[in-house]
Amino acid sequence: MSTPDPVDPAQFAGTYYEQGSVKQFFSIGLVNTTATYSLNANGSIKVENSGNYFFNGGPQSSIVGSAVPVNADNTALNVGFFGQAPSATPPGNYTILAHAPDYNWVIVSDPTGNSGYILTRNQTITPQEYQQLLAQARALGIRGPITPTIQYGA
């Protein structure tokens, strides 16, 4: 895995639309998937993931957790869900591999490269933009099969 540029949590905060991911058991069939990050007063980051199952307006799935940086560049985080308080101990389970200078897109994974997400601020992107981000995700070490995520309504 490559060394990413430092992350400014304030600029990173906000809503991202999942354009593609290595599907996990809990995300199979999800569409309109988003990840929203906000800063907590204690320095941790609130993580809110949501989407609809199978179709636009389908049953909603959402989960809320928190994350804490585990390195000085804020590129490695430990994320905890289900009330689990994340530890600030490296190596972290969530790595921001790359981001646009304006945080218009981010590519994230875990330290092994077996999971991966392509996230953008825009709900839809062009096929060319998707292919560029997909190629970059592969070059950064994401090994799992990344499949597109359907985003309706844009």
Give, region by region, the residue ranges found by the protein language model.
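A beta-rich soluble binding module of mature secreted/lumenal proteins
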Residues: 1-154
